[in-house]
Curated annotation (Swiss-Prot):
InterPro entries in the cross-refs: Arginosuc_syn_C (IPR048268), Arginosuc_syn_N (IPR048267), Arginosuc_synth (IPR001518), Arginosuc_synth_CS (IPR018223), Arginosuc_synth_type_1_subfam (IPR023434), AS_cat/multimer_dom_body (IPR024074), Rossmann-like_a/b/a_fold (IPR014729)
Name of the encoding gene: argG
Residues holding L-aspartate: T122, N126, D127
Protein name: Argininosuccinate synthase
Family label: Belongs to the argininosuccinate synthase family. Type 1 subfamily.
Matching NCBIfam families: argG, PRK00509.1
């Protein structure tokens, strides 16, 4: 194929239905030289097969970029330290992968001299915003092509028909129509019968987990160790980031931990439903939260809760590269200085419970809280504290009493 004088476009390529169709569509519609880029963030894929398929479908080049460790250290761990959870449930597995993927697409586009980046996110979803916000933040001169917003294919069924017509092999059929996103942190399931919120999801969709009902009848205990908010060891064994998360995924998944079925508010204004499996991440969040309870004071804990909510919203909305996000990271990092220690978790039938914790920087002091005889806390001191603490209440009560007495006297005079 002659590509010498063609403009180049970098396509975020997964080898799945949408991007396989988009690759061929870009050639037909724009006449671009298509460079496929598959970013490995820990998903279980045959990357050699993906590269082969991209080239066979018409790509002039196919990049396979493994950024799994960078994903964990630079994206997952900061979000973990922030305690960021979207709408109380979602651990942001898809959300924080998009800025890193977009960053790599920009790097490849700049290296190849491409004029555009294309992606397979739909016009109804959050990912289009996450991809494009990052691309605009890193290189505003690159054109962005989002076929789902412009082409005549209106459904995944249409894409299947297009693929069949063009001889593109695809991994789904009209009977298996779930849309999935996977990385080392989680896997999500959307679409199909999940679009009706009255339909209970079937546990046959699970990829990382067993259902809680089918998990072992005896609990498993696991001990996690943290250093300044970062997990460093499992059951006393030091792990590199990838091996650690792989180990925790197996542990949590075996007990049905980390499965959620939620209806969430998308950035674009609609609600969507998804089933998410985040076994290892659920363990890390539970342990980190327990350790913070041991090491952070009350005011910091309270204030950080608000920061966590805002942080989660920024990540969910794709605003990773913003001044506010950078500022929040500085605050979060300052809170993690003493979040060091161990937490023991109990895994049982889908539940993950922190049952023990210890830290050299613990603010929990048994000498002060004991119900037995103690020699460090003078309980008589509490009286003066309570008098001052409740002084506003006392003053208000005296004012009301005086006012009521005055009104009573006026009534007698009348």
């Amino acid at each position: 194929m002659e590509t010498k004088n063609k403009k180049k476009v970098v396509l975020a390529y997964s080898g799945g239905l949408d991007t396989s169709v988009i690759l061929k569509w870009l050639e037909e519609t724009y006449g671009y030289e298509v460079i496929a880029a598959c970013v490995n963030v820990g998903q279980t894929e045959d990357f050699a097969a993906i590269k082969k398929k991209a080239l066979a479908t018409g790509a002039s080049k196919a990049y396979i970029v493994d950024v799994t460790e960078e994903f964990i250290t630079d994206y997952i761990f900061p979000t973990l330290k922030a305690g960021a959870v979207y709408e109380d449930d979602y651990l942001l597995g898809t959300s924080f992968a998009r800025p890193l993927i977009s960053k790599k697409l920009v790097e490849i586009a700049e290296k190849e001299g491409a004029v555009a980046i294309a992606h397979g996110a739909t016009g109804k979803g959050n990912d289009q915003v996450r991809f494009e916000a990052t691309i605009k933040a890193l290189n505003p001169n690159l054109k962005i092509i989002a076929p789902w917003r412009t082409w005549d294919l209106k459904s995944r069924e249409d894409c299947i028909d297009y693929a069949v017509q063009h001889g593109i092999p695809i991994p789904v059929t009209k009977k298996d129509i779930y849309s999935r996103d996977e990385n080392i942190w989680h896997i999500s399931h959307e679409g199909g019968n999940l679009e009706n919120p009255w339909n209970e999801h079937d546990d046959t969709i699970y990829k990382l987990s067993v259902s809680p009902e089918k998990s072992p009848d005896t609990p498993t205990y696991v001990e996690l160790e943290f250093y300044k908010g970062i997990p460093v060891a499992v059951d006393g064994v030091k792990y590199e980031p990838i091996d650690m998360l792989t180990t925790l995924n197996k542990l949590g998944g075996a007990h049905g931990v980390g499965i959620i079925d939620i209806v969430e508010n998308r950035l674009v204004g609609m609600k969507s439903r998804g089933v998410y499996e985040t076994p290892g991440g659920t363990l890390l969040f539970a342990a980190h939260k327990a350790l913070e309870k041991l090491t952070l004071d009350r005011d910091t804990t309270s204030f950080k809760k608000g920061i966590s909510v805002k942080y989660a919203q920024l990540v969910y909305d794709g605003l990773w590269h913003t001044p506010l996000k950078d500022a929040l990271d500085q605050f979060v990092n300052s809170t993690q200085e003493f979040v060091t220690g161990q937490v023991k978790l109990k895994l049982y039938k889908g539940n993950c419970t922190a049952v023990a914790s210890a830290s050299p920087f613990s603010l929990y002091n048994e000498d002060f809280v004991t119900f037995g005889e103690d020699h460090v806390y003078n309980q008589q001191d509490a009286e003066g504290f309570i008098n001052l603490f409740a002084l506003p209440l006392t003053i208000r009560a005296l004012m009301l009493e005086e006012k009521l007495q005055g009104e009573a006297k006026e009534k007698k005079i009348i």
